[in-house]
Amino acid sequence: MKVVLFCGGLGLRIRDAEDIPKPMVQIGYRPILWHVMKYYAHFGHKDFILCLGHRADVVKNYFLNYSECVSNDFVLSGGGKKLSLFNSDIQDWQITFADTGINSNIGQRLKAVEKYLEGEEEFLANYSDGLTDLPLPQQLEHFHQQDKVASFLCVRPNLSYHMVSLEEGNENLVSGIHAINNGTVRINGGFFIFKKKIFDYIREKEELVNGPFQRLIDERQLIGYRYDGFWAGMDTFKDRQHLETLYGGGAAPWEVWKANGNGRREVDVAKESLLSSSVG
């Protein structure tokens, strides 16, 4: 199944990332976009469509100059001329790079790549700035059982705010207070599944949630998949710090692919840009 990833937004609220696409903000050695792609690839979905916008060159150049050595163990021999990787990240990925406009919204970006989804009855999509350990096949099974046009992940917000209840008739008297993530509030966590019919609901210049989703709701064609496992978005510098802490401590729940290895394979050192630049 193809995976549409929205990569055109800015990281304005993330320190030192104001001028790059937010999905290119790094978690460990790789951008969060890579972590999202690894998640989907783990479940067999390796055909990606990247909806590019602001600083599209950053995304393109990252993959054009991709080095497997950064995130994989390897053996260097033959005086630096022979490289054997124990694992490979993107060898079997197919990536379509689509410029979808500098200031386009999500609805416009999705509509712009409709032509690359020809023949697909359904597809996956993601904001590319959130991570989860969700067993994706479970969400897909739920989607197929419900037989609706669209589905997205419904998660509890990871916020430090508290929900406050005020007593009726006395708006100054607090009747309850609790952490927002302990209540009944759920938010749109992304991780969309769409039938191709979604394009019938998108009008020109409409944001995905404001227009198309409202029409889907009116026709009872939008479902949410409730998930209480790990989910974390990256909207602020604090969010990034949290993900970096999990990654650095070896407890990154979203790395569902960690148990799988692809075996050792030989690589042309000249094609490994990071290695060739450091070995001389």
How does the language model describe each region?
Residues 121-124, 131-144, 156-160, 169-269:
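Catalytic-core segments of class I nucleotidyltransferases/pyrophosphorylases
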Residues 28, 54-55, 101, 156, ...:
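Short beta->alpha linker loops
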Residues 3-5, 50, 125, 150-153, ...:
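Structural beta-sheet core signal
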Residues 1-66, 97:
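N-terminal glycine-rich phosphate-binding loop and ensuing alpha1 helix
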